[in-house]
Every structure is written in C-alpha cells, then in structure tokens.
Amino acid sequence: MRILGVNLSNNGSICVLNDGEIELYLEAERLSRKKRDYNCTKLFKYVKNVDKIAISDACWDQHKKKTLISAKNIATLKKKFPNAERYDLRDRHHLTHAACGFYNSEFEEAAVIVVDSSGSNFEEGDECETIFHVKRGRRFHWKVLHKRYNTEDDIGIGFQFDMVSEKCKWGREEAGKVMGLAPYGFYQPSSGLGYLQSSNENAAA
C-alpha cells in the first residue's frame, strides 16, 4: 500500500510510504529556495500512484493568502489522484503533533503532551494544550485525557514563545527555534522578557 502524507503548513512537505517504508520525502523550500515555503503543488509531480492521502495543515483562517494556496494544493491532489482515498486531518492539529512525536519514539504506549497555541478550532475555542493517551497496534489508538482552549485573556504557552521569538527579532515562525534553545537557558529578570510572566498573572487575576 502506498500512502502520501501532505503537510500544507509553513514547512510544506510530502512523504510517500510504501508498505510502511519511506520511499520519498521532499520539502517545498528545498526546491523553491524560499524558507518555510508552504506551497506543495510543485512536489506532486514526483509522486506516482498512491492508494491513500493524508492531509495535514495549520490553521490559516487569519492568513487568506495561505488559505487560498492550501485550497490550490488540495485541488491539485484531487485532480492528480482522483481514485485515492483521502483523510483530511486539518481539524486534528494537536493529534497529528502527538502522532508524529509518538511514532518517532520507541514507546509502545505513552502519554503525550502537546503545547501549541495554534491548534484546531473547536466550539470551545482554539486548541491550546492537549494531553493524549496513545498506543501502538494495527491502528493508532488514542484518547484525549485533557484539553485546554485559548481564551481572550489567556494566550497559552505557544504564543508566549512567539512573543519571545519576535523579541529576539527572529519572527514568529521561528518560535520552534526558541523552544529548542529554551532548555539550555535560565531565567534572567533583567532580560526584558519579564512581561510574559506579568501578563499571565494579570490574566489569571
């Protein structure tokens, strides 16, 4: 069975699994030379017939240009692979994070914490933090143990990393770099970033 995974987020990429083995992996920015390119249409020409397609995306409601390009990517997929079974995971943003982390580990069963302030939108609000219980098997077994949503007075940890990244003049899309460096640092009251703590205290009050 050949499965095509498509990531339409700000690191546009595709991956083809052939009977569970990686056959092809490509990132859009490697071909376009545009950092964090999210337009995958140019990648599909390297893919032959597939049986299933799994589509993952970020939440671009506030970015009309990116939303339109995502729609173009999906339209291209439907035209090129009309008989492939499609799984739209765009409303399972935190779940895809959890699955990615879990399947790259050696655990058979685990609790996975996803801290991402830009999760999928639900009636209660945008996903902010989610804890899953996950387990391997013939199918991916998962259960939500806890979920917290963004509110007007609580931006969540993910957006705090966005703010720090902007403070470092890297831009919000480099927040992942800040997260990776965070464990190597320590709190410095004179750093000028203390407003993050005070903003949360005000929100809690």
Which residues make up each language-model segment?
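Short acidic/glycine-rich loops and adjacent helix/strand connectors
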Residues: M1-A205
